[in-house]
Regions:
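A short alpha-helical cap/connector motif
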Residues: 1-102, 109-130, 134-186
Length: 186
């Protein structure tokens, strides 16, 4: 399977995928820093892990997916890419002695703070954490939001405020696609 085929499958099945500008930004970060390893939170069907694996610097990707159905499909779609290791687990239970150059958080938006707190210990000293979809623009043009949508928007806004106020971190919010946050330890 090639990347375009997987992208088509994701779109046809309404599976969210990393947007092109965000992917380009992350590839620039990888290239500029010579990063070789990625921890991804939120595999879905594996589109972003597949895309990252095409970067020649990347030697190892561990991607975590909580949903068993998505995990099974990702295993099938990515089975030929040896540098990708897929884990079926809620990220808060993930443990490893391995450290990663880049951590890409694209999991449940209502649990971003918990995911960030848990995953930061897996980051190399000069590593970067990237959080995707900080703006949730899909809700911007809706006249009425459900109570759950309002709660989700509030949680994401709280996470953004929490993240920017973190001691010991340089945090940059980039207004591309649906918003990307770049976090690097000071």
């Amino acid at each position: 399977m090639d990347l375009q085929t997987l992208k088509t499958i994701c779109i046809e099945n309404h599976i969210p995928i990393i947007r092109d500008k965000t992917l380009d930004l992350i590839n620039h970060i990888i290239d500029d820093n010579g990063f070789t390893s990625i921890l991804e939170v939120g595999t879905a069907y594996g589109y972003s892990a597949f895309a990252f694996s095409l970067n020649p610097h990347i030697k190892n990707i561990t991607t975590i997916e909580k949903n068993t159905d998505n995990y099974s499909l990702a295993c099938e779609y990515l089975k030929d890419i040896k540098k990708i290791h897929i884990v079926n687990l809620d990220v808060i239970f993930f443990k490893t002695n391995e450290k990663f150059d880049l951590i890409f958080i694209d999991g449940a938006k209502s649990h971003q703070e918990i995911m960030f707190e848990h995953c930061q210990k897996f980051l190399n000293n000069n590593g970067i954490i990237v959080v995707d979809n900080i703006f949730l623009k899909k809700f911007n043009n809706r006249k009425e939001l459900t109570r759950n949508q309002k709660r989700l928007l509030s949680k994401v806004k709280e996470f953004e405020t929490w993240l920017v106020s973190r001691q010991g971190w340089n945090v940059k919010i980039i207004n591309i696609d649906d918003g990307v946050v770049i976090c690097k330890k000071k």
